[in-house]
């Protein structure tokens, strides 16, 4: 019976790491033997970490896509590589291909569905903060089972995810800064200690006894909060100032709501118009409107009549005509010189005074 219990304990619990697992002591220099693929992955992590840390909120869609890709790829890779799929143990390459395909799908969903992307960003923030708490409490607290670190990870992740959905702008800025700083610290850990700090985190999550950290590991661990604080300040004051993806989403939603209301009003008017019976005409056909009085024409000034010499009877002629009627021809000859200034026609009489006067 004790042998059976010891066998089960050996199968369930991880083996205790030896000195070769943790490398050389702090006083001795490490043997750095880099490989091409891990080094390339760490360089890519460093580049993505810079984008996350200092341009996270400005590259909002890209951050959502990369977060979904990271979650989907890691989870599917662990499931495919550790477990048997269709009663077949997949190789690392096949597991990586499947994980990459499903990770791309998860990234697209996180980018297109904003709430899913924000939930994953907040969940990642909570997981990183829980891991940092486990690392910081290593000299003072040793978990007795794996349920303690697991509960801390799940509780912190769900809490930060819900807070990110409630306050997306500040929590997204904080999450991107912390994630970017963690990626940069991981890349630096590979080139400095061959991921010794990463293995330390894994053993803490498994509740396994670990030796105390070296000063190099503590220096890399202190780099994480410093870069996080710097990333938050840079995004708050420089890169993310003036940008608001929340207002863009709200304006789009308001525009859609306004369009829906307009369409509903048009549909209601159309239904009312169709339901309303046609009215009979109360009067006969209307006569065409009578044309109004024409506009008064422009009254022109009459053309002045031109007068010529001889058109007007001279006063001398009128006087001579009167003298003939009265028979005093002598007065007519005497008055003719005095009336010469008022003549407009000929100065002499129109007809000669020959013969006896004619009575008219």
Curated annotation (Swiss-Prot):
Residues 260-304, 324-360 are annotated as: Disordered. The chain crosses the membrane at residues 36-56, 59-79, 93-113, 116-136, 145-165, 177-197, 218-238. Residues 286-296 have a biased composition (Pro residues). Its main location: membrane. Residues 326-335 have a biased composition (Polar residues). GO terms for biological process: positive regulation of canonical Wnt signaling pathway; Wnt signaling pathway. Disulfide bonds: none annotated. Pfam families: TM7S3_TM198 (PF13886). It is found in: Membrane; Cell membrane; Cytoplasmic vesicle. Keywords: Cell membrane, Cytoplasmic vesicle, Developmental protein, Membrane, Transmembrane, Transmembrane helix, Wnt signaling pathway. One of its GO terms (cellular component) is cytoplasmic vesicle. Promotes LRP6 phosphorylation by casein kinases and thereby plays a role in Wnt signaling. May be a membrane scaffold protein involved in the self-aggregation of LRP6 to further enhance its activity. Belongs to the TMEM198 family. This is Transmembrane protein 198. It comes from Homo sapiens. The gene is TMEM198.
């Amino acid at each position: 019976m004790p042998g059976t219990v010891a066998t089960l304990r050996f199968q369930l619990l991880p083996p205790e790491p030896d000195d070769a697992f943790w490398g050389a002591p702090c006083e001795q220099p490490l043997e750095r033997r880099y490989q091409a693929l891990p080094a390339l992955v760490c360089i890519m992590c460093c580049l993505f970490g810079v984008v996350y840390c200092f341009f996270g909120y400005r590259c909002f869609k890209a951050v959502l896509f990369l977060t979904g890709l990271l979650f989907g790829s890691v989870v599917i890779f662990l499931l495919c590589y550790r477990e048997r799929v269709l009663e077949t143990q997949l190789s690392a390459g096949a597991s990586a291909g499947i994980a990459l395909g499903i990770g791309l799908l998860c990234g697209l969903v996180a980018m297109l569905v904003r709430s899913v992307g924000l939930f994953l960003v907040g969940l990642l923030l909570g997981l990183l903060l829980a891991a940092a708490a486990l690392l910081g409490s290593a000299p003072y607290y040793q978990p007795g089972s794996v349920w303690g670190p697991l509960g801390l990870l799940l509780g912190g992740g769900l809490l930060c995810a819900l807070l990110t959905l409630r306050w997306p702008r500040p929590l997204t800025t904080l999450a991107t800064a912390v994630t970017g700083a963690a990626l940069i610290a991981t890349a630096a850990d590979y080139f400095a200690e061959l991921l010794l700090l990463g293995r330390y985190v894994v053993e803490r999550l498994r509740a396994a006894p670990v030796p105390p950290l070296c000063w190099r590991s503590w220096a890399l661990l202190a780099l994480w909060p410093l870069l996080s604080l710097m990333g938050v300040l840079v995004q708050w004051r420089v890169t993310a100032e003036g940008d608001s993806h929340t207002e863009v989403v709200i304006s789009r939603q308001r525009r859609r709501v306004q369009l829906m209301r307009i369409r509903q009003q048009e549909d209601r008017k159309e239904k009312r118009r169709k339901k309303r019976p046609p009215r009979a005409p109360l009067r006969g056909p209307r006569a065409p409107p009578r044309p109004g009085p024409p506009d008064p024409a422009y009254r022109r000034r009459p053309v002045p009549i031109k007068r010529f010499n001889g058109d007007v009877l001279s006063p001398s002629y009128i006087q001579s005509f009167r003298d003939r009627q009265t028979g005093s021809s002598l007065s007519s000859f005497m008055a003719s010189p005095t009336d010469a200034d008022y003549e407009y026609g000929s100065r002499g009489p129109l007809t000669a005074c020959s013969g006896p006067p004619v009575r008219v």
